[in-house]
Amino acid sequence: MAANPPGQGFQNKNRVAILAELDKEKRRLIQSQTLNNPGASIPLSRPAVNKEFRDQAEQQHIAAQQKAALQHAHAHSSGFFITQDSSFGNLILPVLPRLDPLE
């Protein structure tokens, strides 16, 4: 096993001290900004209500796309199709009929 160089312990302590000082300065700056600008502590992200509304609108858009794809498939194909969520992003899936085996 190789021994650590003599100056490496000093370098590690120096790095830890620098990081601690930077962290302290960062906290001080954040605290002074929130005291000077009380509105700065307001989160910039939108509330969950907007996210739920966006998700609902997205689902309605997908449902409309599925309906259009299903109508197109029925009009231009002799096969059977259903709307179902697919792992591969397909809006509609073909349905294969089950045939009774011949005896």
UniProtKB/Swiss-Prot annotation:
It comes from the Eukaryota. Keywords: DNA damage, DNA repair, Nucleus. Its main location: nucleus. GO terms for cellular component: nucleoplasm; nucleus; SOSS complex. GO terms for biological process: DNA damage response; DNA repair; response to ionizing radiation. This is SOSS complex subunit C. Belongs to the SOSS-C family. InterPro entries: SOSSC. Component of the SOSS complex, a multiprotein complex that functions downstream of the MRN complex to promote DNA repair and G2/M checkpoint. The SOSS complex associates with single-stranded DNA at DNA lesions and influences diverse endpoints in the cellular DNA damage response including cell-cycle checkpoint activation, recombinational repair and maintenance of genomic stability. Required for efficient homologous recombination-dependent repair of double-strand breaks (DSBs). Belongs to the multiprotein complex Integrator. Component of the SOSS complex, composed of soss-b (soss-b1/nabp2 or soss-b2/nabp1), soss-a/ints3 and soss-c/inip. It is found in: Nucleus. It holds the Pfam family SOSSC.
